Curated annotation (Swiss-Prot):
Residues 1-113, 138-172, 228-256, 396-416, 540-583 are annotated as: Disordered. Highest level of expression in heart, and moderate to low expression in skeletal muscle, kidney, liver, small intestine, placenta and lung. This is Harmonin-binding protein USHBP1. Pfam families: USHBP1_PDZ-bd. Residues 189-227, 289-309, 476-513, 596-681 form a coiled coil. It comes from Homo sapiens (Human). One of its GO terms (molecular function) is PDZ domain binding. The gene is USHBP1. Belongs to the MCC family. Residues 1-15 have a biased composition (Basic residues).
Amino acid sequence: MSARATRPRSRRGRHAPPGELDPVAESSEEVEAASGSSKPSFAPPPVSSGLEQLGPMEEVSGQGLGSRTDKKMDGGSGRELASAPEVPHKPAVEAHQAPEAALQYKETVPPGNGAPDVFQTLQHTLSSLEAAAAAWRHQPPSHSGPMEFEGTSEGGAGSLGKQEGAGSCQREAARLAERNAWLRLALSSREDELVRTQASLEAIRAEKETLQKEVQELQDSLLRLEPCPHLSHNQAGGSGSGSSSSEADREPWETQDSFSLAHPLLRRLRSHSSTQILGSLPNQPLSPEMHIMEAQMEQLRGSIEKLKCFNRLLSAVLQGYKGRCEGLSMQLGQREAEATALHLALQYSEHCEEAYRVLLALREADSGAGDEAPMSDLQAAEKEAWRLLAQEEAAMDAGAQQNPQPSPEGSSVDKPTPQEVAFQLRSYVQRLQERRSLMKILSEPGPTLAPMPTVPRAEAMVQAILGTQAGPALPRLEKTQIQQDLVAAREALADLMLRLQLVRREKRGLELREAALRALGPAHVLLLEQLRWERAELQAGGANSSGGHSSGGGSSGDEEEWYQGLPAVPGGTSGIDGGQVGRAWDPEKLAQELAASLTRTLDLQEQLQSLRRELEQVAQKGRARRSQSAELNRDLCKAHSALVLAFRGAHRKQEEQRRKLEQQMALMEAQQAEEVAVLEATARALGKPRPPLPPPQLGDTFL
C-alpha cells in the first residue's frame, strides 16, 4: 500500500470517544481487510487534483461509511433483534455524530509548531478520503449477500413464524430507505465540510498572496542593503523544518537589532508554520468561471489593441486629408487669383473692343465727310469716344476731373478734330493693352496637388475596416460639392449679416421711441398734476355753488347777519384784531377777490385747453412721424432685400457667363493653337529649301 493509505494508522492506539466514529481507523481496517486475501497494488490519486475531486471523493466516502454500517449491522444482528424499535432512529444519530467525529478528528491532529496548521489538516482529510475511496473501489461486488443475510436474520428473528417474501422485501426496502436517508445526511455534512474547507482555502490563498508580496518587498529591501553572512544563515535556518532552537535563531538577530526592526517580516515568516509547505502545494486548477473571465479579458485586450491601431490609422488618414485640404485651399486661392486676373483681362479686352469700334466709326465718318455724309454719325462717334475717355479719367482719378472734356457745342477753336480724338483713342487702347499685358494669365492650368501615396492606401484600409463593421462609410466629397457647400455657407452668412443689420435698425428705432417716451413722461406728469388741481377747484366751486343756491332765497341782510354772527374774540381783544377781522371779512373786497379768482381760473382753463390741444397735436405729429419712419424703414428693408436678391441673381448670372466665356476662351485658345501649329508647319514646309536633283543617268528621260 502507499504511504498515504498507511499514514492514518498511527491513530489506532487512540480510542475514539464513545458514541462517535473514527472514519480514518475504519477506512484503514477496511483497506487491510480488502487487501488481506488478494493484495492488489493501487496508486491513490495525487493531491494536485484539488477541489475538483472533493465532490466525488465525498460521495465515495459516504458510500464507504454506508458499507461500514452494513458490516456493523451484520455483526450485531442479535442486538438488533433485541432492540428492533430503535433501528429507525440509529442512522440519524450516526449522521449527527459523523460531523462531530470529523471535527474532533481535526482537533486531535497535532499542530506543527504549536499553531493551528490548516494545510496539515487538509492533507489528513484528503488522505482519509483517498483511503475510503480505495476501500470502496476494491470492495468485492457481492456485498448484497450480507445485506440479504442480515435481512433474513432480522426477518427470522423478528417474525413469529413463517412469513411470506413480501414482508421481508418491505423490511429490506425500509432498511434501504433509512440507509439512504443516513447517507444523505452524511453527504450534507460532507458538503458543509467541503464548503468550510473551500472558504479556508480561499483565505489561505489570500494570505499566501499577501505573504508573497511581503516576501517580494523583503527581497527588494535585502537587495538594497549590504550582504550579511549571519542574515543568510538565519534565513536558511528559518526556512528549514523549524526544529532549530529559539536561542540559535535569536543570536544573529540580537547582533542586528536595527535590521530586525527594519524587517519584522522575517520573524513572522519564521513563526508562521503554515509557510513551510507553501512550496510543496501544487498549483490549484482554475474554475470554469475564471477561464471564461480570462478569455473575455483576452478578447477585450485584443479589441483594445485593434481599436488603438484603428485610431492610429484614422489619425494618419486625418493628417493626410488635412494636408490635402491645405493644398486644396492653396489651389482655390490660386484659382481665385487667376479668375480675378481673367476677369480684369476680359474687362480690358471689352474696353479695347469698344474703343476699336468707336475708332472704326470715327474713321468711317471721317472718310465719308467729303461725300456729304450726315454729321450725326460723326457727332455720335465723338460723344462715344469722349464717354470712354471720361470713364478712363474717372477710373484713374476718383476726384474731380482736372481736364474736363471739351463740349462739342463750343467754338471751332476749342473743338478737337476727329484726328485728335482718334489719337487719344489709340493711346487709350495702348494703355489698356499695357495693363492687360501686366496680367499673368496661364495658358494651361497649373499642376494639381498630387495626393500622398499613403493616403489612398490608408483610406482603403479604413473603408475596408468600416465595411466589415457596422456603421456608415467615410464621406467622399468632390470638389464641386465642396464649392457648392462653400457658396451655400457664404450665402447663409450674408443672410445672417442682413438679418443682423435689420435687427440693429429695429433696435435703433426702439431706442429712439424709448427716448421719445421718456421725454414725454415729465409732460404727462405735469398735465396729470394740472388736471388734479382743476378737479379739486371744480369740486370746491361746486360745493360753494350748492351752498349759494340753498341760501339764495335770503336777502343781503341775511349775509350781513351771517357776517355779524361770527363769534367775537373772547377775553376782550384789542381794537387792532377787531379791525383786522373786519377788513378780512369785508363783503365788497371778498366779492372782488372772488371775481378776480374766477377770471384767473377761466384764463388758466383756457390756457390748459390750449396746451392740451397743442400737446395732442404734437403727439399726433409724433405718431405720424413714427409711422412714417416705420414705413420708410420697412420700405428700405424691402428694397435692401430686393437689391440683395437682385445682386445675388446678377452675381450668379455673371458667374455663369464667366464660366461660359472661360469655356469659349479655352476653345478659342485651342483653335488658335491648332491654327498656329498648322501655320508654323506650313511656314517651315515653305521655307525649307528643296534638295538638288541627282544627275540623269543613261537611259533616263526627263519628264
